[in-house]
């Protein structure tokens, strides 16, 4: 009897152990502490405003080397789509003598799509409308211009092709003119960036039987530096030059594509 009792006790102990282990293995794990889930913003809005010693566009001064006040806003979605607007004072249309009054403003509107393949490679496609409000002389081709563009970037280097689907900056019969922009913004330090650029403007079509490109095609280049300060402030300066011909780019007695320097201060927010 004692032998049987010991055996039974051992058997019951084994069963209890197995049951306890089984319950431990099948019991649900304690729920992890819930992590705070931040909602994804449907879009972001950023802005910028700057004061420049002059406005240079594709190697050409747009303000006859006088100061320019510039600013804009951009809206971007998490999916890569974006839209924005930007403006600056100008003087080149008055200098060209093609307006009665007005035309002292360039107002741009644009939208497109950006995609990042990885941390190094990306692309950008979109449309850009240049608008120059004003009262123009009769028979003048208005400078309002629409361009489609596509760009690719690798780290700090970008290559952008812009194709005009309208007349280009007031030149008659200039549809399909284009501009190619190769730029590199190399970070020297966490706050200093070296800015370089070379571009090529090609005009298509004819005016009064002469090819537009004969006097209007040119190459431009730029080199400069930018300092990123605290609070979204940027300070910089750059040197620009071009091969713009006197016959095509002399306004108010001066070639607007000659070598010049520009300084600026900009605030982003």
Give the ranges of each region predicted by the language model.
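Surface-exposed loop and membrane-interface regions of Gram-negative outer-membrane beta-barrel proteins
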Residues: 61, 81-142, 209, 215, ...
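Detector for outer-membrane/organellar transmembrane beta-barrel domains
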Residues: 143-213, 239-240
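Residues that define the transmembrane beta-barrel architecture of outer-membrane proteins
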Residues: 43, 65-69, 103-107, 142-148, ...
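Repeated loop/turn-to-beta-strand initiation elements of outer-membrane beta-barrel proteins
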Residues: 79-85, 119-125, 156-161, 190-196, ...
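Transmembrane beta-strands of outer-membrane beta-barrel pores
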Residues: 51-57, 87-91, 115, 129-133, ...
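Outer-membrane beta-barrel "beta-signal"
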Residues: 223, 227-233, 254-269
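Structural signature of outer-membrane beta-barrel channels/translocons
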Residues: 74-80, 114-116, 151-157, 185-187, ...
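Outer-membrane beta-barrel biogenesis signature
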Residues: 22-47, 56-69, 224, 248
